[in-house]
């Protein structure tokens, strides 16, 4: 069994100035304790393994936690339902955020297991990997996703992030079953060469599954998972090639977002909150 040591000491140093953002009974904040991170891992286990049917390894099966070595070097964004109280059940949404320094401590970013990140690593600005995004089934809807995006915008502003990236998943492991979605993404949202990470050779799945002229763009967009549609709304690109993730029963694509393309409403909302100005 693999043991992962949890410590929020480094995270507290990075996120001490992050002020919780509220929307009614919900709030978005950074994890500041080991218990916070454990609650995020428990939520991830419920969503990824119990709900979506991912195949757990020995540690996940025994601990009922989705956890790995990257958790210790990441910042964890949490959506909290305050009326539930201070316990782990109050964490209803989460995102894992990894900067260059955290990745250096491990020796790689998480996405490097699927993609050659060379073009992104050569990017001269500050980069941030987004991952392990999930929301409790009872809370899936606009409110929680809006809060998560507001939290990301706040974090980006606080840390001067210039580029975000990370894997996003489509359900299933048959790329031909999602041929229109993959072909649409490749044809309409392929990253420019300077930012075009490519799936590793032994994992590369061509996204051009059909004649681009035969793709109904509107239907393809509607068929995309909400998370990917959200990324596209803030100007996301995709890398070259999809990757089959059989343990998680998904097909992954790499998302790349230049933060100067992020829809202004999130940043402007955060700035208004910081000034104490109502929406």
Report each predicted region and the residues it spans.
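Short acidic N-proximal helix/loop "leader" segments that mark the beginning
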Residues: 1-23
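Short, cationic low-complexity segments
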Residues: 273-279
